[in-house]
Amino acid sequence: SSAQPLSLEEIQKLLAQDCLHLVCAVDEDERILGMLSLVVFDIPTGRRAWIEDVVTDQAARGQGVGQGLVDAAVEHARELGAKTVDLTSRPTREAANRLYRRVGFLQRETNVYRKSF
C-alpha cells in the first residue's frame, strides 16, 4: 500500500531515529529519482538490516535507479555490521523481484505474517 505524503515534522521525526537510514538517488539537478528505507537493528542473534519502501520515480524506471539504491543500501548495511539484509516484495511486482534476485537476494522458505492495528 502507498503511504500518505509526510509533513516536514513527520520526516524530521523519522530521520531522528538512529536505526533508520534513507537512501536516495538524485539526478544532476538534485531531483529525487528514488529512495528506500534501510533499518538496521540489533537482536540477540546479531545485527540485522531490513529494506522497506523502495520507490522509483515512474520516469526513472528501467534506468538502474532501483539497483543503485539496493546496492547502496546493502553496502551501507554491511559497513554497519549487519549479518543479513531482508526485504519483502509482492509476487505481482515482477520487475522488482527480478532485480532482487539479480543482485543476490534469495527467496526464503518462510511465511510472513502481519497484524495490523
Which residues make up each language-model segment?
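Conserved active-site alpha-helix within GNAT-family acetyltransferase domains
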Residues: 67, 79, 91-109, 114-115
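Acetyl-CoA-dependent GNAT
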Residues: 1-46, 70-71, 76, 107, ...
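Conserved GNAT acetyl-CoA-binding A-motif
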Residues: 70, 77-89
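Conserved acetyl-CoA-binding loop-helix of GNAT-fold acetyltransferases
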Residues: 56, 62-75, 98-103
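Short coil/turn motifs at secondary-structure junctions
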Residues: 41-43, 59, 92
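Conserved acetyl-CoA binding element of GNAT-fold acetyltransferases
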Residues: 47-58
